[in-house]
Swiss-Prot record:
<feature type="transmembrane region" description="Helical">
    <location>
        <begin position="218"/>
        <end position="238"/>
    </location>
</feature>
<dbReference type="Pfam" id="PF02673">
    <property type="entry name" value="BacA"/>
</dbReference>
<keyword id="KW-0378">Hydrolase</keyword>
<protein>
    <recommendedName>
        <fullName>Undecaprenyl-diphosphatase</fullName>
        <ecNumber>3.6.1.27</ecNumber>
    </recommendedName>
</protein>
<comment type="similarity">
    <text>Belongs to the UppP family.</text>
</comment>
<dbReference type="InterPro" id="IPR003824">
    <property type="entry name" value="UppP"/>
</dbReference>
<dbReference type="GO" id="GO:0008360">
    <property type="term" value="P:regulation of cell shape"/>
</dbReference>
<feature type="transmembrane region" description="Helical">
    <location>
        <begin position="184"/>
        <end position="204"/>
    </location>
</feature>
<keyword id="KW-0997">Cell inner membrane</keyword>
<feature type="transmembrane region" description="Helical">
    <location>
        <begin position="84"/>
        <end position="104"/>
    </location>
</feature>
<dbReference type="GO" id="GO:0071555">
    <property type="term" value="P:cell wall organization"/>
</dbReference>
<keyword id="KW-0472">Membrane</keyword>
<keyword id="KW-0133">Cell shape</keyword>
<keyword id="KW-0961">Cell wall biogenesis/degradation</keyword>
<dbReference type="GO" id="GO:0009252">
    <property type="term" value="P:peptidoglycan biosynthetic process"/>
</dbReference>
<feature type="transmembrane region" description="Helical">
    <location>
        <begin position="144"/>
        <end position="164"/>
    </location>
</feature>
<feature type="transmembrane region" description="Helical">
    <location>
        <begin position="46"/>
        <end position="66"/>
    </location>
</feature>
């Protein structure tokens, strides 16, 4: 391990935190960066472990809301329905992710061209949804009905394809099912907590014999950068999308996907 490895870990942690909660696919960005810049020393297990920084970022920002949910849960039926809705939305990813884990890691994660194509397709979808004259029926995540939560959960499973984006799929699904932009992004935040925690725990178990103690410093640096940048994004994203929508992220995806695809076609 040298200074370059630490800078690499810091850069990857920064990218993870900045892109995890916005609809641009953090996994897709990390895979493309690893492919084009040759960041191989940390490996894909490292990329999973630094997600813990992003998980703790959202838990930190949402600590007051989570505490209120915890205290209201025993006596408030609306709060219980919301928590049950999050669990229902999480179940499809938990089941399908466990069953398809090997295929996802060994095939989908090794196909950078697929990442670029999904980034481009997702960019067009975001731009399309953003300009629709939708009439939202739900302005508070607490009011999402259980069938809607389950549908969002199945839509989230599309994000097992790198480049699709977990937050992008859940936000688009929520919007098309009647949510407004702010609550769609917030529901994506809440759903990220069990989904990311579950993926982290499962990948950590699967990779328990791969990481060595020598990787501790790299993971620590990546974790800190993912946490700091993740806190920044979570704090400001809801206000941003309420005012400006998702157009910026649609163009972001189109540019990154197109540049990546062109580079793959030219240099491989």
């Amino acid at each position: 391990m040298d200074v370059f490895n630490l800078l690499e870990a810091a850069f990857l942690g920064l990218i993870e935190g900045l892109t995890e909660f916005i609809p641009v696919s953090s996994t897709g960005h990390l895979l493309l960066i690893g492919h084009f810049l040759g960041f191989e020393s940390t490996g894909k297990t490292f990329e999973v472990l630094i997600q813990l920084g992003a998980i703790l970022a959202i838990l930190t920002v949402y600590s007051a809301k989570l505490l209120k949910i915890l205290t209201d849960f025993p006596r408030d039926a609306r709060t219980r329905r919301f928590v049950f809705g999050i669990l229902v939305a999480f179940l499809p990813a938990a089941v399908i992710g466990a069953l398809a884990h090997g295929f996802i890691k060994s095939v989908l994660f090794e196909t950078p061209m697929l990442v670029c194509i999904m980034l481009i397709i997702g960019g067009f979808i975001l731009l399309w949804v953003d300009q629709l004259n939708l009439r939202p029926r739900y302005h508070d995540v607490m009011d999402y009905p259980l069938p809607m939560c389950l549908a969002i959960g199945f839509i989230q499973c599309l994000a097992m394809i790198p480049g699709v984006s977990r937050s992008g799929s859940t936000i688009v699904g929520s919007l098309l099912l009647g949510a407004d932009k702010r609550s769609a992004a917030e529901f994506s935040f809440f759903l990220a907590m069990p989904t990311m925690a579950g993926a982290f725990a499962y990948d950590l178990y699967k990779s328990r014999n791969i990481l060595s103690l020598n990787d501790g410093a790299l993971i620590g640096v990546g974790f800190v950068m993912a946490f700091i940048s993740g806190v920044f994004v979570v704090r400001y994203l809801l206000d941003y999308v309420s005012r400006h929508g998702f157009k910026l992220f649609g163009w972001w995806r189109l540019i990154v996907g197109s540049v990546g695809l062109a580079a793959l076609l030219v240099w491989g």
